[in-house]
Amino acid sequence: MNTADITAYMQNVGKEARAASRALAAANTGDKNAALMAIHDVLKNAKQDILSANKIDMDNGQKNDLDAALLDRLELNDARFDGMLQGLKDVAALPDPIGEVTDMTYRPSGIHLGKMRVPLGVVGMIYESRPNVTLEAASLALKSGNAIILRGGSEAFESNQAIAKCILEGLKKVGMSEYSVQVLETTDRAAVGELITMTDYVDVIVPRGGKGLIERISRDARVPVIKHLDGNCHTFIDSDADPEIAIKVSVNAKTHRYGTCNTMETLLVDEAIANELLPKIAEAIVKADDAMQLRLDDKAQAILNDNTTLKGHLSAATAEDWDTEYLAPILAIKILSGIDEAIEHINTHGSHHTDVIITDNYTKSQRFIREVDSASVMINASSRFADGFEYGLGAEIGISTDKIHARGPVGLEGLTSQKWIVYGHGETRA
């Protein structure tokens, strides 16, 4: 399609989405859940078609030299497919936030007022790799009464179109508008430019992908954006940490999965326990993955450089390492004087995503969660828990590190807003 065709195509997509959003806003919980379960059934029967489409994408990705992190996100295997099916059930089982009325109060004037939760309207989502996001985002949009326009990456085109076919069939089975969920049928980047500027038809944009994509969307969008740039997550091992917990959590936070935004990228260790505990943590992390590379500040080098178990896994950290989301088996390690320096380092170099303290000291734990300026702050738990499913939100449409509207994992409630409702009996303002 040429530029004029793309503009016309996107304008039509936007108009249909706006019309569908009005019908969805009026849909009851039963109708929305029926749509989710109809999509579940169609998807389950189309497993081989979807996995075959994904294999085409994976083969193309390997031919095009996609990096390991992107290939990991792109892949759909049996476990991830089953997770997609379960995700639909989980979202259907969640309480419906739409229509919830809170904070009802009487005013001296005689009016009775409160707040009602309502859909945002039309959500535009732009994302890379992860074809399961297509289904997760669609399910959350439907349950929260929003229409959604989905633009996946070209590397996942075949997978996304196969999933879109199932969504469309499921919607038709229950008589819901086929425009409630639209997966764009073009990989032309001009479509993204149109989507993020269609203020008449789109109420919010949610980008998920690399830092370059997020920065471009944030810079060029005229529609409000819910976003996070990257996931430079920290774990701080305090002087009062339980050694067993420190080792276990550090290994999980770094090695559980590399291509995710809640993976630990920097390990901070209090100097009071570094000599004793850091070698044990480092050895455990390298044992979990022999490909691991540890990038050390001067103090960490002094402790670890003579460790024969870690030979071939160590190098000196540079200033850039403290600001880097690796998405790879690379971990930066820094020795600090204590919690003051840890909080300062995290707030200076972190991405305000998820940060962790390992400590048995209640006072320090409470100070950490108050003063660290991140969307999720954890005590004695892996940063990998920063996830919509783990937080009980069902699927998540993304994670926001912004402070306005939604922060942290964005589930159903993050796709809604509140309007004031007022009941009266003929009251007039004096």
From Swiss-Prot:
SUPFAM superfamilies: ALDH-like (SSF53720). It catalyses: L-glutamate 5-semialdehyde + phosphate + NADP(+) = L-glutamyl 5-phosphate + NADPH + H(+). The gene is proA. It comes from the Bacteria. Pathway: Amino-acid biosynthesis; L-proline biosynthesis; L-glutamate 5-semialdehyde from L-glutamate: step 2/2. One of its GO terms (biological process) is L-proline biosynthetic process. Pfam families: Aldedh (PF00171). This is Gamma-glutamyl phosphate reductase. It comes from Psychrobacter arcticus (strain DSM 17307 / VKM B-2377 / 273-4). Its EC number is 1.2.1.41. GO terms for cellular component: cytoplasm. Belongs to the gamma-glutamyl phosphate reductase family. One of its GO terms (molecular function) is glutamate-5-semialdehyde dehydrogenase activity. InterPro entries: Ald_DH/histidinol_DH, Ald_DH_C, Ald_DH_N, Aldehyde_DH_dom, Glu-5-SA_DH, GPR_dom. It is found in: Cytoplasm. Catalyzes the NADPH-dependent reduction of L-glutamate 5-phosphate into L-glutamate 5-semialdehyde and phosphate. The product spontaneously undergoes cyclization to form 1-pyrroline-5-carboxylate. Keywords: Amino-acid biosynthesis, Cytoplasm, NADP, Oxidoreductase, Proline biosynthesis. Transmembrane segments: none annotated.
